[in-house]
Amino acid sequence: MTFLVLANFKSHKLEAEVTTWLSAVAPALAQSPRLKLLVAPSLLHLPASHTYLSTHPIPIDLVAQDVSPFPPGAYTGAINASQLKEYGVTYSLVGHSERRRYFHETHQDVANKVNELLSCGITPAICLSREDIVPQFAALSDDQQNKCIYCFEPPADIGGTTTAPLDVIKDTVAQIKNYTTAPVLYGGSVTPENVASLLTLPIDGVLVATASLDASSLTAIISTCSHAR
């Protein structure tokens, strides 16, 4: 199975910095045929990223950081799935802990976003804490569950240098895989220094945020993942 590395820029970087970053990681991808890099820039930078990747042969999939739970219509300020599709988006994060915490998104909100994404052929990347697993899967139909990818991200372990304990990650990933055959990633303080230990676990990829902002740091993670898998 192809190992996934998902880089989430959150609200970092300006447009020129994004394209410079894309160029900088390209050589590492040429040496990593069994790995797929997914990149989630700011929604504002998806058009420029799409244009850049359309003219440069870099094997990177574009990811949206969020999507409207509504179809096209009178929803001021919302960006719907069909609009994301127009700019080459193939995946979209949904249910990130920061969206659940700061924007009070519910499990049903996430399920509505999943429905919109799947209707446009975009793969949802559903972020889950341990506490989200049961209610989030309950909000999804059986058909939807296997058409997504999943990211276990314990909120307490985001933005630091230490991951969740490996036994906790292993147990939680197993819980998620009881519901689905889809890929399951781990996210939460993934760094070049600790990613090798994560590769001993039955995960299908990693979600990288802070450590992805520096191209050399992300390149080191790609290299480790590529040689270990």
Predicted regions and their residues:
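Hydrophobic faces of well-ordered beta-strands that scaffold small-molecule active sites
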Residues: 5-9, 37-41, 62-65, 92-94, ...
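Glycine-rich phosphate-binding active-site loops on the catalytic face of alpha/beta enzymes
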Residues: 93-102, 154-161, 202-221
